[in-house]
């Protein structure tokens, strides 16, 4: 490490599951991580930025079988093939330093050693698993954890699972994990702490299944043939094996561990804030300094998923609008710790307003006036005015606020600060009226200072946006003729005095305005899904007539429907079932429907099921729905009947 470096900084994305090509939701986390890595490099840190792919598991094995290839061939195609993971990160200008695949030989060997160490110290033991299993999530659940009999994470069907397995004594570390979460800033945003403690730790942590025998595509447990290491150990330890833990592929573990921050989606916060630190505690290893759980990127108000056919292709958006514009939109528009609602209209509007009108227009006007009035040469001299001091003070305030917000991973707020300066510089043009100053030789010195101030504001703004829009920042520096030493973090001090000189040039608009109507039509055409729907064959199971007749099917009217707090899956229905007393049913269909679109609908419910507790609320019955598969992913539709049918009518 060089003497001028501030120190080492280790940042990671989650490793992505290559069961299909990645979409803009995956790019969101990776772009944010890249922006943070670039920001820290800009500040002078020696950065290690890790990303990669989590390539084992039953879902991969099954998908490979369907495709008629080996699991290794399947993941190789998704990761290395055309428009695969590596192509996507190249397209999005992701500056990762290391890419790990859990199928890499060094990682496989390291995982076997790690598993054996935890077995030898007594924290892994052999037993039998019996319960429910969600293949898409690769998660085990108890009956009480299911939502309407389905996976509480994704809402899909689960299957019975019973097999010999090894378990990790997660329960042993419950108190230490709770203390870590409640009394440190290990997990952010703070709202995630309450979710983890109240939903997982306080109800009681159960020991964790960490091996499987029902499939073979995984890291073999070398001392017990037939078992493969399950995802928790295999995937989570990538953050350390990629630095050389339990292998000799790399040797920078001592320099970069513990990680400064893991960026992860909120759906995997539980794994990173409970399971991961418990395993590190088991081995006596330092914990990462922070886990930051960002929100989801929704599309038109709905969670982005392949099953809905609403995933957004970053290749299409980058081709039409540019990579930097897309990166900017993702981090400018959505607070990083909260869910964001992606729409094409919002994307185009943001590009037109912030980039074309504000930043692009400021650069174009400034360089054009510099060329027109001074031939691009802003030499020594000038005339100061009090308005310049106001501009300088704002620039210094913006720089301080920007640094504070970026250090807190608040990219959107940091960019807001940069655009405060950009907006003020545009106003400064209107206040100083360079076109009037240019009419007289007597006011030429004042015009020179005005142009220098504008160039300085743009230069500082370019430094601030450079982690998010690296290519655009470089283009701006080039137009202003800024030397390399004026492009770094240490050059962000405001300097537009008489001794400052600039050699500017003009060029094509950095961010051309977009025709909203034309682009929306083009995007709609490009994103049309295939119309083919595949219906999964089912295994017929006979039920005798008397058993069927025991179920009481009734028409119910939806009086109210609201999301259940602290649950991404559940909707709470208030129903008129014809009895004169409202019936409450909870259903895990939040990813398929907006609550407001169900009010007033007539549905079908089984009303004689015993009440059950879900997220601390009582659910009295079950709503009927139809499930089908489209492009290999589940879709769900509630059974809706004629509104003329009265509440309480019996269906038979």
Spans of features found by a protein language model:
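Phosphate-backbone binding interfaces of nucleic-acid-interacting proteins
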Residues: 530-652
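A glycine-rich helix N-cap at a beta->alpha junction
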Residues: 80-95
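Structured secondary-structure scaffolds
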Residues: 2-51, 106-110, 154, 160-372, ...
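Intrinsic disorder at enzyme termini
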Residues: 476-549
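Beta-strand segments within the central parallel beta-sheet cores of soluble alpha/beta enzyme folds
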Residues: 290-293, 477-479, 572
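Helix-rich, typically C-terminal accessory recognition domains appended to large enzymatic cores
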Residues: 126, 132, 338, 346-384, ...
